[in-house]
Amino acid sequence: MSSSSSSSRCCAAGVFLVPSLLLLPLLLSLIHTAHGATLREHRLSGTEPVSYGPPSQLRPPPSAEMLRALRYIQSLSERTPADPDQSDQDAEDDMESVRSVLKMASPTRREEKDNTQELLQAVLTTLQQTEEHMKTPQKVIAAPRYHQFARPKQQVKVDTDDGNYGRNSWAENRRRYREYPIMFEDDQPLKRTNENAEEQYTPQKLATLQSVFEELSGIASSKTNTKRSDDDEDDEDLYRQRKMVLEDIMGTDDWTPLEEQMESEEEERERHGFTRNLEDDDEDDDGKRSLQSDWLQTQREEEEPEDMAKLVDYYLLQMLEKKEQEQQKRQEEDEEEEVEKKDEEEENVEEREVKPMQSLSEILKISQKLRIPPEELLQLLRNENRKDLPGRTGYAHKTFPSAPHRRPIETSDIAQDILSILELASAAQQNQRPTQARNERYYERQTSRDDYDDTAGEEDELANYLATEMQRHTRMAPLRDEDQPVNLQNYYEKPPAEHENAATGIDNSTMMKILRLLDPESDDADETDSDAGEKVPEM
């Protein structure tokens, strides 16, 4: 029994020891962390306000400017009319707003207890201390070199009034001009005062004051809005409650008097009758519109052919008028062209006309100036006139038979007969060269759309050929009188027949033969050939 009891005790002790052994590492870790997280005093940063630090780090009490700010706040609160019923609620709201501001400004103290009452008591004590300090004279520790000018009492009273808060009288408080100029930058009189002001008015203090003022103004404006909304909601709630009670008592049926019910029924009947009349009027209007549309369609169908005929006539008249106008314009243009041509011809004739007296006088003047006899001047003028004649210049149709890319002109029998008549048989024989292979891409026939005559091309070729032969003959001929010196005696000694032949060059008979060859189908040509019985002379 003793052995069994001892074994059971050992088992029970082991059962209790196992969980304690498991909890040992947790305890050790907690002890280690507790030793590591040693508690120490909170030190403020450069931007954190002094009021949130421990009492050992508190700065000296606020100055007169802080008192003026607090008095200004109290004056603002007094200006707003406060209701006696809701004064307690306003105080509670102000306390809640101050607490919320403190909580927002101090995020590190969210886990700590709410010490708002202690903070308020501290603020009140500081205010009392400042008042006592203001009443009792204090020794001001001045800088070793610089001494502040004492302001008069009137100016101090004006500055410390509640109404003058926020108004800076910097222009009036300027220091007097010194007799001697400043020698160094350290001698500036306002440097030390600026340092003191920076210590008293930090940007955080100013920001907190500004936020307090903004919240106070927002609270004053929100109170009025909330009051109105609350009153409206209360009225609506009362109306709903009364309505619910009446419905529970009287039921959902209408409990209006009989007269009102009768009036409402009559109004409904009148409305129904009015709507029925409107529907009937709409149906009548639809019927009338359908009838009008049918009547208009029939009229249009009847008027369509008449309209088409009128349109056709109208367009025809317009076309005729346009044609007449075009014809008139063409006639006017033709008349203008004819008038211009006549004017040009008259001008040319006037220019060509030579007045004998004026021409002789001009020739004599020129001969006197140039010291040339008048006979030589007349001879020179005659030679120039002969050169300017249109028959002598053959630039109208230029041909280049010697070019390699042109084919030679094939002379027909009629052309040979004409050349023999004109004493050009030798030139025709020289031109008859062996024909080359025709290259069609250089000799494509180009005719206009209106040219349907096949013989026009042949006639043009023949005319060109004759013109070239005439030019060649003139080149091969001996020099004329214009190139050789003129012998007036030989010229006048010649008989008149030679002069006529030189002037005409071709007899009338030869011209008639040329015309017959050009028109072989005419009967008159055959008759004249039979009557004459003459042969063409061959050279």
UniProtKB/Swiss-Prot annotation:
Q: Which key words tag this protein in UniProt? A: Cleavage on pair of basic residues, Secreted, Signal
Can the keyword Secreted be found in this entry's annotation?
yes
- Bias type Basic and acidic residues, positions: 438-450
What is the purpose of this protein?
Neuroendocrine protein of the granin family that regulates the biogenesis of secretory granules. Required for normal courting behavior and spawning.
User: What species was this sequence derived from?
Assistant: Danio rerio (Zebrafish)
What outcome is recorded for mutants in which this gene has been deleted? No effect on development of central arteries. Decreased courtship behaviors and spawning success. Normal gross gonadal morphology in males and females but males produce fewer spermatozoa. Reduced levels of gnrh3 in the hypothalamus and telencephalon and reduced levels of oxt and avp in the telencephalon. Reduced levels of lhb, cga, fshb and gnrhr2 in the pituitary. Simultaneous knockout of Scg2a and Scg2b results in greatly reduced ovulation in females.
Comp. bias regions, Polar residues = 427-437
The signal peptide annotation in the UniProt record is: 1-36
Q: Does the keyword Signal apply?
A: yes
Which stretches does UniProt call biased (Acidic residues)?
85-95, 256-268, 333-350, 520-531
Which protein family is named in the record?
Answer: Belongs to the chromogranin/secretogranin protein family.
The protein's name is Secretogranin-2a
Taxonomic placement: Eukaryota, Metazoa, Chordata, Craniata, Vertebrata
Q: Which InterPro entries match?
A: Granin, ScgII
Q: Where in the cell is it found?
A: Secreted
Coiled-coil annotated residue ranges, if any:
none
Q: Which GO terms describe its cellular component?
A: extracellular region; secretory granule
| Matches recorded under Pfam families | Granin
Main subcellular localisation? secreted
Segments for region (Disordered):
76-97, 218-237, 250-308, 325-358, 387-407, 427-456, 517-539
